[in-house]
Amino acid sequence: MSSFKEFKIKWGMVIDLDKCTGCGACMVACQAENNIAPQPDASNKLKSLNWLVVYELNNGKPFPEHDVAYLPRPCMQCGKPSCVSVCPVVATDKNEEGGIVSQVYPRCIGCRYCMASCPYHARYFNWFDPTWPEGMDKTLTPDVSVRPRGVVEKCTFCHHRFMQAKDKARVEGRDPSALRDGDYVTSCTEACPNGAIIFGDFNNPEHRVHELHKSKYAFRLLERLGTDPQVYYLSRREWVRRLGDNYLEHEKVKG
């Protein structure tokens, strides 16, 4: 896999799975913020579309040892994204400001190579033009484009909020390249009632995620693939960390 340069700013998430209750508030907030049209039947995998999905995990043991965890899965904004490597028209790329993997919809030709290459299944193809119930079209976020039929879309870490935070910093006479912790947060971070999703700059010591992602209980999904995800998870439960990278029984798990 080709290498990618390091960025001064590295936006990322730390998601505490021991705090997540699987309520789905993050999913709803993501849909509302990013103009994702609601579907009457969410089980219809052809028509339903979610940039953020919450998965239920369990340890496979019977009661009373049975245990459950919930895992929110946004785009991992990989440091070495396989989706970028395979796109024939450069419709997806690593953003220079923060390392977010961008998606340029007018360039996308709908080949879906990026979907096939993503090990996290975090990309979605628009088979249909989006439609909204009467009145809901007036509540769309003006800074987020509505994606047409025939293109691939995904989580962007609410990049429009990043642009807004930089504009606000300029107005206040601050350096837009040195945002404070909390100046720029994603909609899912804002909506989580338990504070399970923490967002910030991994490279900034003043941001909470700077220390959290170094915890001995931190892990990343399928880390051994070498994609360098910018989303970390926390859990004190070993079985949860073991599932994160498909560890075998004899392999030692971090933490």
Swiss-Prot record:
Checking PROSITE patterns in the record gives: 4FE4S_FER_1, 4FE4S_FER_2
Q: Which residues form the 4Fe-4S ferredoxin-type domain?
A: 11-41, 66-97, 99-128
Q: Which residues hold [4Fe-4S] cluster 1?
A: C20, C23, C26, C30
Record carries keyword Electron transport: yes
Record-listed [4Fe-4S] cluster 3 binding positions: C108, C111, C114, C118
- Provide the primary localization: periplasm
Q: What class of enzyme is it?
A: oxidoreductase
Q: What InterPro entries would the database entry show?
A: 4Fe4S_Fe-S-bd, 4Fe4S_Fe_S_CS, ET_IronSulfur_Cluster-Binding, Menaquinone_reductase_QrcC
E.C. number(s) listed in UniProt: 1.97.-.-
For this protein, what does the record note about how its cofactor is bound? Binds 3 [4Fe-4S] cluster per subunit. Binds 1 [3Fe-4S] cluster per subunit.
In alphabetical order, the GO MF annotations are: 3 iron, 4 sulfur cluster binding; 4 iron, 4 sulfur cluster binding; metal ion binding; oxidoreductase activity
UniProt-listed Pfam families: Fer4_11 (PF13247), Fer4_2 (PF12797)
Among the entry's GO cellular component annotations, what is one? periplasmic space
Where is this chain's protein located in or outside the cell?
A: Periplasm
Annotated binding of [4Fe-4S] cluster 2, by residue: C75, C78, C83, C87
GO annotations under biological process? anaerobic respiration
Keyword set, alphabetical order: 3Fe-4S, 4Fe-4S, Electron transport, Iron, Iron-sulfur, Metal-binding, Oxidoreductase, Periplasm, Sulfate respiration, Transport
Q: Where does [3Fe-4S] cluster bind?
A: C155, C158, C188, C192
Cofactor(s) required for function per UniProt: [4Fe-4S] cluster; [3Fe-4S] cluster
What is the purpose of this protein? Component of the respiratory Qrc complex, that catalyzes the reduction of the menaquinone pool using electrons transferred from the reduced periplasmic cytochrome c3, and which is probably involved in sulfate respiration. Is likely essential for growth on H(2) or formate since the periplasmic hydrogenases and/or formate dehydrogenases act as primary electron donors for the Qrc complex. QrcC is an electron-transferring subunit; its cubane iron sulfur clusters form a pathway for electron transfer between the hemes of QrcA and the membrane quinone pool.
Q: What is known about its subunit structure? A: The Qrc complex is composed of four subunits: QrcA, QrcB, QrcC and QrcD. Can form a supercomplex with the [NiFe] hydrogenase HynA1 and the tetraheme Type I cytochrome c3 TpIc(3), its physiological electron donors.
Q: Which PANTHER family match?
A: PROTEIN NRFC, PROTEIN NRFC HOMOLOG
Protein name, per record? Menaquinone reductase, iron-sulfur cluster-binding subunit
- Whose protein is this, by species? Nitratidesulfovibrio vulgaris (strain ATCC 29579 / DSM 644 / CCUG 34227 / NCIMB 8303 / VKM B-1760 / Hildenborough) (Desulfovibrio vulgaris)
Instruction: Please name the taxonomic classification of the source.
Output: Bacteria, Pseudomonadati, Thermodesulfobacteriota, Desulfovibrionia, Desulfovibrionales
Q: Source gene? A: qrcC
